[in-house]
Regions:
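Metal-dependent de-N-acetylase/amidase catalytic core
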Residues: 1-136
């Protein structure tokens, strides 16, 4: 069982952008991740059977990075060295992005432009924006 110190997830309060409404599944995933981090994972009383029957002890996540709009961000991560890996991974999501060359090219252009737009104000070629939470 992996007990992460750092969790990266969607910001469930990030409901829409200037030209889109964010997918409800992404918001729900962010809410679920945050609920699992606190109080579920760190509270013995939430699932006592996991301690008693499985020997799984409570765990405290130390840091959370919420993927968010730039206006809500407190941290910008330089992804310049890994942007091509990100693009390649997202191109594999064929049911969502298509498989024809034109669609994949538009996806790559859009992803790189968005990362550039996020990074440029911070002197970063390509970046992602996060709301950082340090848990006590």
């Amino acid at each position: 069982i992996h007990q992460p110190d750092i969790v990266i997830c969607q910001d469930p309060t990030n409901r829409y952008g200037d030209s889109n409404i964010h997918h409800p599944d992404h918001r729900a995933a962010g809410d679920t991740a945050l609920d699992a981090i606190f109080p579920s994972a760190r509270d013995y009383h939430m699932f006592p059977e996991l301690v008693q029957d499985e020997g799984l002890l409570p765990h405290k996540v130390l840091e959370v990075y919420l993927s968010t709009r730039e206006s809500n961000a407190s941290v910008w991560i330089d992804i310049t060295d890994t942007i091509d890996i990100k693009v390649s991974a997202l191109k594999q999501h064929a049911s969502q992005v298509g498989t024809d060359a034109e669609s994949l090219e538009r996806l790559e252009t859009r992803l790189k432009q968005r990362a550039s737009d996020v990074g440029t104000p911070h002197a970063i070629k390509y970046a992602e924006a996060f709301k950082y939470i340090r848990l006590r």
